[in-house]
Amino acid sequence: MIEAARSFPQYQFVVAGAPGIEPDFYKQYIDSSTKIVFGQTYRLLQQAEAALVTSGTATLETALFRVPQVVCYYTAAGKLVSFLRRHILKVKYISLVNLIADREVVTELVADGMTVANIKKELAKIVPGGSGRPLMHSEYDRLIAILGEPGASERAASQITALLKSNHKA
């Protein structure tokens, strides 16, 4: 990540530290120009121009903040994982954004695909002025429409309650 960050000197790189991970853990991966913040992920996303995100709910949260992102997931067994993904595993995507959209909305750099060169190339596409930024914003709008308006759990609970009441009367 440090090498990739050096290619974008006009931006401040900030790491949103994960709960339960000590700050010292991150120091081996970053240099003094990169900040680490804890407990302020949403505030950070409100300010972000683009993001490198590990897979999980963070990818969906980043999309809901409409921050263009590249999903990065490294594993020491990169070649094996890449082989398994291509030939055995049935899941096309690892990020919630792509799984929900059922197509590639965000680039996933996984296992041996996560290289400094690939990070730089994909990040350049989504920073302001990048060629992929407008399309990603458009795809985020589509994703948000798929997810529906806020209050989905309340609407689901109301529908379940109504269904139970109607079945109880029958």
Regions found by a protein language model. Name each.
Residues 1-170:
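Nucleotide-activated sugar donor-binding and catalytic core shared by glycosyltransferases
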